Amino acid sequence: MALKVLVGQKLMNEVVKYKPPPPKKQGVTSAAGAGGMEWRVLVVDKLGMRMVSACTKMHEISAEGITLVEDINKKREPLPTMDAIYLITPSDESVRGLIRDFENPARPMYRYAHVFFTEVCPEELFNDLCKSCAAGKIKTLKEINIAFLPYECQVFSLDSPDTFQCLYSPAFASIRSKHIERIAEQIATLCATLGEYPNVRYRSDWDRNIDLAASVQQKLDAYKADDATMGEGPEKARSQLLILDRGFDCVSPLLHELTLQAMAYDLLPIVNDVYRYTPGPNQPDKEVLLDENDDLWVELRHEHIAVVSTQVTQNLKKFTDSKRMGSADKSSMRDLSQMIKKMPQYQKELSKYSTHLHLAEDCMKSYQNYVDKLCRVEQDLAMGTDAEGEKIKDHMRNIVPILLDANVSNYDKVRIIALYVMIKNGISEENLTKLFTHAQLSPKDQDMVRNLSCLGINVIADSRKKQYSVPRKERTTESTYQMSRWTPVIKDIMEDCIEDKLDLRHFPFLEGRAQNTNYHAPTSARYGHWHKDKGQAQVKNVPRLIVFIVGGVSMSEMRCAYEVTNAVRNWEVLVGSSHILSPEIFLSDLGSLSKED
């Protein structure tokens, strides 16, 4: 069952459809709609809003009596005859907002409050709430234990980009423990939602991973104490949660990727998953949400750009043939506006094909303008060999012309320098300064490279031993695209973890839990299904590998979760992080790291 569907069902059943008992006081009026349904307001904070937007549809929540969705941090009109459902994180800001709504007893914002915290409320905040004037208005107070954002069916985010600063910047050392507690609770709610009690392991080459792993284990134990069935069932004893720091692979977030999703988010101005394009001459701009409600996007997002346009065109031809719209030649396929005018009843489907043709074309335009020459150099740097497999002796010959090229952006120059520094395991200060001078980088741009040291990367060569790196698998074949030879390290890690080949010295299990990764119980087709309601999410009878990266997951790494799941079939791989990365976001995160205590 897809993560989004699972969370959507839980939000609908436990929050939106929640029906409080009627008020006992006489003379209290309520806002009743047609058919006697009582209208309510849904009040959310940032995470609550993103969860609702990602996992539910407005018409679904309206059908359950939600007339309005409001932001707790914005000014709102009082609706004192209506009850409000609050879906908020138990944070200082959100709890203060809740208290503020009822601080004036003569003019409360709403009639009563039904509060659903995303996770466990800290005792101090809970006490503040109990002592406040809002306490008498709170008729429901529950924890739903969903403190994460299902980004895709196998990808999750904690919606916490500040994790990068908190865990990698020396300036944030004083609040680090508190932040680790917070994200550990969020990760534990993911496991609880999935019904998993996984064996926890971590990359030992970064000190803070064990702190996070131990904190997650503590939270998992608390959930297990509340629900003994968590983690039970055939194969579930083999499920694992693997915690990685971002330093395990800083190459993948920096490379120009040529699969559709990664390429589009790197090269095009996609904001909040919204792609904007102009359908044709004298036509207004169109905005399209790239998400899993679009089956064509799901089909194409992990495909190499070389085949995307062809695939869209083939799909379109199949569609037009099936609807007997006549055979379309290639030119009219590209100008779908005429088809839409002729067949308005198929506007939705034809618009979808139009969107993806434009998306692929926009990506190819950027690629052909300048990205193609960057890709070859980046791939050679990452692999250490050229397209023929020959070891490259002098990378500088390829790098310097790009650094001197005024048409190449500073961001792209930083990417090239960072890749070079990493494959050399650090270079001299003198050589680094020369590269910066060639590229004419500002001090802020230079910080993006220098701050890789905060992630454990050797930037300036010294006597330090090179960090352990996972042994790479040979994957290049004749069918491999020359500009896409690199495979993210996480794919090797996922495969080795499932095959029980991951080095235990560098990826140990947390002590105190009996690992049973080789447990192969006979699988019952009925288990976890026969006793469930039809409306509930079905439980998969396979172990899960949940990979969490501290400090961002790239689009290419997200793709690996699907590839490994499809290849092994008897495991499901999920990957997630504090936030979702594009190369620009990763560089921006690096640039903002402060080294001051």
UniProtKB/Swiss-Prot annotation:
Gene3D superfamilies recorded: 1.25.40.60, 3.40.50.1910, 3.40.50.2060, Syntaxin Binding Protein 1, Chain A, domain 2 (3.90.830.10)
Cytoplasm in keyword set: yes
GO CC term (a single one): secretory granule
Function: May be a component of one of the vesicle trafficking pathways. May interact functionally with Ras2 protein.
Membrane topology: Peripheral membrane protein
Assigned protein family: Belongs to the STXBP/unc-18/SEC1 family.
InterPro entries: Sec-1-like_dom1, Sec-1-like_dom3a, Sec1-like, Sec1-like_dom2, Sec1-like_sf
Species of origin: Drosophila melanogaster
Any coiled-coil regions, as ranges: none
Annotated keywords: Cytoplasm, Membrane, Protein transport, Transport
A GO biological-process term: follicle cell of egg chamber development
Compartments where located: Cytoplasm, Cytosol; Membrane
Entry protein name: Protein ROP
One Pfam family this sequence matches: Sec1
